[in-house]
């Protein structure tokens, strides 16, 4: 059995860990980073993922996709998607199934498909680190993700070639890492403010048991919103100072502003003031325009004060659901890059009445916990019990459009709950089961997870048939619903997948595309390596020819130069085999060149001809003419 990796699939950055023995270990990417930007870019020739995609975003804004996690499991017409469209330099559309998708070069990509590209890179990085194929993973999601968003994440894993052994809530993963090997019993609050989402979870940790008491949050609140406030401020100030020029209409300028806003936000976590300096940001008939502006921490805090305040109400609700007060919380653990912001830390301290615990790395602790969960599933980590909860209530629509709950929010999972219903009309031949998730009293105000029909009900007066509806939530938080006519024993069930999400056929098609792309990547890597090797061989050979000058045999020189010309002509070709063959031929000819070089050195004599390694043996010849000197030690 191979390793089960732990992946934190983040809005802004992603991270991957693995258990090595009893210790979780961070897997660095080839660029040397411990986290990888959750960015995918498309160029005319290739697809880029991670740091390399982020670096070219300014020059390629419309084809560089970031923060796609915000679109996972959402409909194209959802209000949150509409808000994101206003600020996004890339094009967001409704896919064929109605879900939010990204359109690049005329082709729509679903959110799970883009996420799969990020997961595919993390998988490849893990394989390079471990030296073995990786097929299994534990992937984290925000605790307040609904069923559609969880299913979309699982689909992304499948497309990337990963068997997702468990979907685990991010605060739960963080608490697992925090509580790993801790014996003391503690009530902790995990305050998780990341790039795109906010979660608060109340847990009991100790003696290798992690039990979630309650969770709450906002799946559309995070660092991207803070960045946007800075961008809007910079755009407004620039417009005011430059005769109404609107940078928001220039996608390339907008991308530069985004990078500057992110940097300024980070700088102001450690300094009181920073300067935003973007020369040649745009131009008009009078010439180029430059953006130079100072931004203070006080100004930033004023811009984002309401965003920070939005984290408070979920904290209150989570504490109430857990039946605890802020004073009963032993530790507040900060997770997510945004918790580095002093204003966030100050508000957390004020609400909970204590300084937050900063002992964990907010960027990595979630992936670390996912790896520990992978170790538990693989049997490598023993005696650790994890008890998670479902974040939202589940139920069905009943007469009058009422939402009838079967499973209350913060119920420990996995769980199963049944309830008996009846018909609303005489001789009703079927019932429609409308499955919903949410907290509002009316069905229309909650999120539809799915619908299915139970048919073949025998004619009877209303109120007579007995229809048992059962909800089953697995450890991933994914829902199965069944309806059974207790009179006939007839049963109908549905496994809830992402609402209007990817069908099985679509997933299989995307899996095949991802595999084909992986093969293409491998071939591309082979081509790059062959070209680099050939280029190095050409350089070395030409240098040797120059060094030998007219001492080189004319016929041999002509033969080698012919082979160099032939190989150089192949450097831009896509034929790996031809490049390798020409490289081998040049290498063989170069061996003769080396032989001639050594022969000439031997004939010439001198230090090069009989040179020995440095040290005693090589130093003796020179020492023959050295006179030993007498000396007297002078005592002080």
UniProtKB/Swiss-Prot annotation:
Organism encoding this protein: Nitratidesulfovibrio vulgaris (strain ATCC 29579 / DSM 644 / CCUG 34227 / NCIMB 8303 / VKM B-1760 / Hildenborough) (Desulfovibrio vulgaris)
Positions where Phosphothreonine occurs in the chain: 197
Keywords, sorted A to Z: ATP-binding, Chaperone, Nucleotide-binding, Phosphoprotein, Stress response
Protein name listed in UniProt: Chaperone protein DnaK
Pfam families assigned: HSP70
Biased segments, Acidic residues type: 625-636
Top-rank taxon, per record: Bacteria
HAMAP family reported for this sequence: DnaK
Function: Acts as a chaperone.
UniProt cross-references to PROSITE patterns, sorted A to Z: HSP70_1, HSP70_2, HSP70_3
Family per record: Belongs to the heat shock protein 70 family.
Transmembrane segments: none
Comp. bias intervals (Low complexity): 600-616
CDD domains attached to this UniProt entry: ASKHA_NBD_HSP70_DnaK-like (cd10234)
Induction: By stress conditions e.g. heat shock.
GO molecular function: ATP binding; ATP-dependent protein folding chaperone; unfolded protein binding
Disordered: annotated span: 597-636
Gene3D superfamilies assigned: 1.20.1270.10, 3.30.420.40, Actin, Chain A, domain 4, Substrate Binding Domain Of DNAk, Chain A, domain 1
């Amino acid at each position: 059995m191979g390793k089960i990796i732990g992946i934190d699939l983040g809005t802004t950055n992603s991270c991957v860990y693995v258990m090595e023995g009893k210790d979780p270990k961070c897997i660095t990417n080839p660029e040397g980073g411990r986290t990888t930007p959750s960015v995918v870019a498309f160029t005319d020739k290739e697809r880029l993922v991670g740091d390399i995609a982020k670096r070219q975003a300014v020059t390629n804004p419309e084809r560089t996709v970031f923060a796609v996690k915000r679109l996972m499991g959402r409909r194209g017409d959802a209000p949150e998607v509409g808000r994101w469209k206003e600020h996004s330099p890339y094009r967001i559309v409704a896919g064929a199934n109605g879900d939010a998708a990204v359109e690049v070069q005329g082709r729509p990509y679903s959110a799970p498909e883009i996420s799969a590209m990020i997961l595919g890179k993390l998988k490849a990085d893990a394989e390079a680190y471990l030296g073995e194929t990786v097929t299994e993973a534990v992937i984290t999601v925000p605790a307040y993700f609904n069923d559609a968003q969880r299913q979309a994440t699982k689909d992304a894993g499948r497309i990337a070639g990963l068997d997702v052994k468990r979907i685990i809530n991010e605060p739960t993963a963080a608490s697992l890492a925090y509580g790993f090997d801790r014996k003391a019993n503690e009530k902790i609050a995990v305050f998780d403010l990341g790039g795109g989402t906010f979660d608060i979870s109340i847990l009991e940790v100790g003696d290798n048991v992690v039990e979630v008491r309650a969770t709450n949050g906002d799946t559309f609140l995070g660092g991207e919103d803070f960045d946007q406030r800075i961008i809007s401020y910079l755009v407004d100030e620039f417009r005011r100072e430059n005769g109404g020029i609107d940078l928001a209409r220039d996608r390339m300028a907008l991308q530069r502003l985004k990078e500057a806003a992110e940097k300024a936000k980070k700088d102001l976590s450690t300094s009181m003031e920073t300067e935003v300096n973007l020369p040649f940001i745009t131009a008009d008939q009078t010439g180029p325009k430059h953006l130079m502006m100072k931004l203070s921490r006080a100004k930033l805090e004023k811009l984002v004060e309401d965003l920070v305040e939005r984290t408070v109400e979920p904290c209150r609700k989570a504490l109430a659901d857990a039946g605890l007060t802020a004073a009963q919380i032993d530790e507040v653990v900060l997770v997510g890059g945004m918790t580095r912001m002093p204003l966030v830390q100050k508000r957390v301290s004020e609400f909970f009445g204590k300084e937050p615990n900063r002992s964990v790395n907010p960027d990595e602790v979630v992936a670390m916990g996912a790896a520990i969960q992978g170790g538990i599933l693989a049997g490598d980590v023993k005696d650790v019990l994890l008890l998670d909860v479902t974040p939202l209530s589940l139920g069905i629509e009943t007469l009058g459009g009422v939402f009838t709950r079967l499973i209350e929010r913060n119920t420990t999972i996995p769980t199963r709950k049944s309830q008996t219903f009846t018909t609303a009309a005489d001789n009703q031949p079927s019932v429609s089961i409308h499955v919903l998730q949410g907290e509002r009293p009316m069905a229309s105000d909650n999120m539809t997870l799915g619908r299915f029909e139970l048919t073949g009900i025998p004619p009877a007066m209303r109120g007579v048939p007995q229809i048992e509806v059962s909800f089953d939530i697995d450890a991933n938080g994914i829902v199965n619903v069944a309806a059974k006519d207790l009179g006939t024993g007839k049963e109908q069930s549905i496994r809830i997948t992402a609402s209007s999400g990817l069908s099985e056929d679509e997933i299989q098609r995307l899996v095949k595309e991802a595999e084909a792309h992986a093969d293409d990547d491998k071939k591309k890597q082979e081509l790059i390596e062959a070209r680099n090797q050939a280029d190095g061989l050409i350089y070395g050979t030409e240098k040797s020819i120059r060094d030998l000058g007219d001492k080189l045999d004319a016929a041999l020189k002509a033969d080698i130069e012919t082979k160099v010309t032939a190989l150089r002509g192949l450097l831009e070709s896509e034929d790996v085999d031809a490049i390798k063959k020409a490289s081998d031929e040049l290498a063989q000819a170069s061996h003769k060149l080396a032989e001639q070089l050594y022969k000439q050195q031997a004939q010439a004599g001198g230090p090069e001809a009989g040179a020995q390694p440095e040290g005693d043996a090589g130093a003796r010849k020179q020492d023959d003419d050295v006179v030993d000197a007498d000396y007297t030690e002078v005592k002080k």
